[in-house]
Amino acid sequence: MVVAAQGIESTSSEIIKLRDTELYPQLLELIKGLTCTWRSMYEAHQVQTHIVQQLKYLNTVPSIESTSEIHRQATLQLELQVQQWHFSFCNIVKAQRDYIESLAGWLRLSLFQFSKNTMSRTSEESKIYSLCEKWHHAVDKIPDKVASEGINNFLTVLGGIVVQQGEEHKQSRRCESALKEFEKRVYELKAIESKYSTYSTLGATGNDPVKEKRVKVESLRAKAVEEKTKLEKSVSTTRSITMNNLQMSLPHLFQAMVGFSSVCMHDFESIYNQQSNKKEHDDVKRIQQ
């Protein structure tokens, strides 16, 4: 029994040693790394915000050209990438929360279990406990919902653009089909006119094949013009929806990301500086003793 107790005590002491001499410095370096990461993200999102804010000064000449297949595929690819961005963003926030929650939970258990008197923790225990508690509090209050909604709203905008481009593509095919049918009937009309040009086409019933063909061709001409007008309107709608929605949604998106990354950067920087100052203070005290 005594041997078992000594073994447990030895193991506990080793865990405490690893926690204080190995885990704590690594966590501090991780916090420092997260500070640098979010500072880089903050600076990048600031630049992106400045760029997209210039969209309101962009004057474009309305194009009558239909959206190309390459353009449509690029829009679909952008939508896919933003979906992945939203998924990855939500995952990384959840992973950070899960990580620090598990770490803080384990630390609380280890402090209560390994320390006979929880009110008299050593300075090393206090440092790692303080670090994890502040970290836990920081990730709990970061404004990830605002940033997530910003990405999701932009995704909705892209979805609307994709739908409109699809409608335009359908109208383009209808226009092309109407034009081909019209051209086909014009060719047939010319053939009939050439065939019956040398004599009267009126039969016993008084029917005129050429006249009937001309009526049909005129009907198809009107149909082709109508479909072309619809296509031009659809192209104009696509351009308007794309430009207006991007001008409105992109600044909101990157402003949300600037806000999120700013909070993360400052929170992690504050935690790191506080813990580093504590470490320097403790080092000075050891030297003076």
Describe the predicted segments one by one.
Residues M1-Q289:
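Extended alpha-helical coiled-coil scaffold domains characteristic of the BAR superfamily
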